[in-house]
């Protein structure tokens, strides 16, 4: 444990940020899993809504620095591909 006052504060702040970031990442992953579950069921309307939510969460995570912007873009592209595949069939 840190002894210097500023180091103690940094440790507390860092722990709060870590918990918040973990929560945001978890919500992002959950949104993606919900979308993928709807794709499996071939429910186009609900999948479209879930895609919008997942896209927003990915963009938010990228803007906050939780994931790289290219990683977010790549994941959104893959999700869009899945959505288009069920819309076509």
From Swiss-Prot:
**Which residues fall in a compositionally biased region of kind Basic residues?**
7-20
Q: Which species is listed as the source?
A: Geobacillus kaustophilus (strain HTA426)
- Which keywords label this protein? Ribonucleoprotein, Ribosomal protein, RNA-binding, rRNA-binding
Gene Ontology CC:
cytosol; small ribosomal subunit
Show the GO MF annotations. Answer: small ribosomal subunit rRNA binding; structural constituent of ribosome
For the region Disordered, give the residue spans.
1-25, 69-89
Q: What is this protein called?
A: Small ribosomal subunit protein bS20
In terms of Gene3D superfamilies, this protein maps to:
Ribosomal protein S20
Q: Which family does it belong to?
A: Belongs to the bacterial ribosomal protein bS20 family.
Q: What's an example GO BP annotation here? A: translation
Q: What role does it play?
A: Binds directly to 16S ribosomal RNA.
The UniProt entry, under Pfam families, shows: Ribosomal_S20p (PF01649)
InterPro entries xref list:
Ribosomal_bS20, Ribosomal_bS20_sf
């Amino acid at each position: 444990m840190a002894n210097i006052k500023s180091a103690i504060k940094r440790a507390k702040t860092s722990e709060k940020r870590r918990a918040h970031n973990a929560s945001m990442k978890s919500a992002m992953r959950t949104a993606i899993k919900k979308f993928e579950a709807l794709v499996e069921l071939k429910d186009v309307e609900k999948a479209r809504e879930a895609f919008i939510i997942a896209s927003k969460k990915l963009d938010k995570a990228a803007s906050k620095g939780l994931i790289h912007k290219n990683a977010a873009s790549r994941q959104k592209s893959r999700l869009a591909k899945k959505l288009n595949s069920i819309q076509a069939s």
